């Protein structure tokens, strides 16, 4: 039995093809390399061109919003890598690439290398938010690392002079693009760290295409920012692309002007805050004085304050009474001490050897000073000294007698 023929319209067929193409995840995000040809810009700002190689070509559409962010010039004959998604333009029945960005050939490798660098620095902790430092509230000196002839420096100076005139600017002039730029920038950051007196550093440039920001995507600049003892503000001036310098810096500003606004206060706001503080302080002082005035008035109303002489007389009487009590206590203590001293002195006197000698006794010592306690302690012919109550005698022993009572 023959299958029933199904007839579809051109619109249905084109819609089916469109749905199949645009639902394919591979075609939703592709990178296509090719040579630009037939490039035209529509009055609306959209860009239309072909990407071709030796075997095929594809139509490309880039809308105005994407054209304004192009990092490379799209000119006939140049080879580029276009990023975008595939779609179908139903009116013409054509499939085409809707470009979301374009880079020079070889940019893919550069992008991969940049991602590897970011992963490496991330592992080492250079992007750690915990290590980022706060910016000083009132910097005296701001170091600036940028081109001396670029718009970035002019913007920074203009903003700082308007917002906070007392701040000094110490410029470390560098190239912001080119082969030597990364090393110049790193050296300038280290030089400002060694200069002394610099409170914060702004590192940046006045925007540019992605490839012109390459110096700020290098390891040497990242490590110089990380090693800086002074807080660093990155101001690359490119809001869409985040550079490695942005990730390492203590503060990221989208533009040099925004960096200047971040590092110095607005003098008008400071004056307003000071005026507010002065007003609050004045109110606090006046309130405190009012409280003390009330307390003083309450004290003045007390009866004692009406006749302070009465209080003084009472205090003098108390002092006089205390003096009398103290004098009596000292006298009693002194008398008791004298009595105890007399008793102890009598006891000591009774035990004194001099009192014993006064009763007719004597002390006999040998020539070497030892006391003779019995007759056996000396020999006939030996000389002894006999001490009396008054004076002494030097005697020669003629004879000794055995112990007996006198």
Swiss-Prot record:
One Gene Ontology term from the biological process aspect of the record: DNA catabolic process
Molecular function in Gene Ontology: exodeoxyribonuclease VII activity; nucleic acid binding
Transmembrane feature ranges: none
Catalytic activity, EC: 3.1.11.6
Family matches, as CDD domains: ExoVII_LU_OBF (cd04489)
Domain of life: Bacteria
Reactions this protein catalyses: Exonucleolytic cleavage in either 5'- to 3'- or 3'- to 5'-direction to yield nucleoside 5'-phosphates
Localization, UniProt: Cytoplasm
Keywords, in A-Z order: Cytoplasm, Exonuclease, Hydrolase, Nuclease
Any single GO CC term annotated in Swiss-Prot or TrEMBL for this entry: exodeoxyribonuclease VII complex
Alphabetized Pfam families for the sequence: Exonuc_VII_L, tRNA_anti_2
Family matches, as InterPro entries: Exonuc_VII_L, Exonuc_VII_lsu_C, OB-fold_nuc-bd_dom
PANTHER family in the record: EXODEOXYRIBONUCLEASE 7 LARGE SUBUNIT
Family, similarity comment: Belongs to the XseA family.
Subunit structure: Heterooligomer composed of large and small subunits.
Function description: Bidirectionally degrades single-stranded DNA into large acid-insoluble oligonucleotides, which are then degraded further into small acid-soluble oligonucleotides.
Protein name: Exodeoxyribonuclease 7 large subunit
Gene name of the record: xseA
């Amino acid at each position: 039995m023959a299958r029933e023929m199904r007839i579809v319209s051109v619109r249905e067929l084109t819609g089916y093809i469109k749905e199949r193409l645009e639902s394919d995840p591979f075609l939703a995000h592709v990178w296509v390399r090719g040579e630009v040809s037939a490039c035209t810009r529509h009055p609306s700002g959209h860009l239309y061109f072909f990407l071709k190689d030796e075997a095929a070509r594809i139509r490309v559409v880039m809308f105005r919003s994407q054209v304004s962010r192009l990092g490379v010039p799209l000119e006939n004959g140049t080879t580029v890598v276009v990023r975008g998604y595939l779609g179908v333009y139903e009116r013409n029945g054509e499939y085409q690439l809707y470009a979301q960005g374009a880079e020079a050939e070889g940019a893919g490798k550069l992008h991969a290398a940049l991602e590897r660098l970011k992963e490496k620095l991330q592992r080492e902790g250079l992007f750690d938010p915990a290590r980022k430092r706060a910016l000083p509230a009132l910097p005296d000196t701001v170091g600036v690392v940028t081109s001396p002839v670029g718009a970035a420096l002019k913007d920074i100076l203009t903003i700082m002079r308007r917002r906070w005139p007392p701040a000094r600017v110490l410029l470390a002039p560098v190239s912001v693009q080119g082969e030597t730029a990364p090393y110049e920038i790193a050296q300038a950051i280290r030089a400002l760290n060694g200069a002394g007196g610099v409170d914060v550093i702004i590192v940046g440039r006045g925007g540019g295409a992605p490839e012109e920001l390459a110096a700020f995507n290098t390891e040497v600049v990242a490590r110089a920012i990380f090693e800086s003892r002074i807080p660093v503000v990155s101001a690359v001036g490119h809001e869409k692309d985040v550079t490695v310098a942005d990730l390492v810096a203590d503060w990221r500003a989208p533009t040099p002007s925004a960096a200047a606004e971040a590092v110095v206060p607005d003098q008008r706001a400071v004056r307003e805050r000071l005026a507010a503080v002065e007003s609050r302080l004045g109110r606090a002082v006046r309130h405190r004085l009012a409280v003390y005035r009330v307390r003083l008035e309450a004290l003045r109303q007390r009866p004692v304050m009406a006749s302070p002489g009465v209080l003084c007389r009472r205090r003098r009487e108390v002092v006089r009474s205390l003096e009398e009590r103290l004098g009596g206590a000292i006298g009693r203590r002194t008398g008791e001490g004298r009595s105890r001293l007399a008793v102890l002195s009598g006891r000591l006197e009774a035990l004194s050897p001099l009192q014993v000698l006064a009763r007719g006794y004597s002390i006999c010592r040998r020539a070497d000073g030892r006391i003779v306690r019995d007759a056996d302690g000396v020999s006939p012919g030996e000389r002894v000294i006999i001490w009396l109550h008054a004076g002494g005698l030097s005697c020669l022993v003629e004879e000794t007698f055995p112990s007996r009572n006198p």
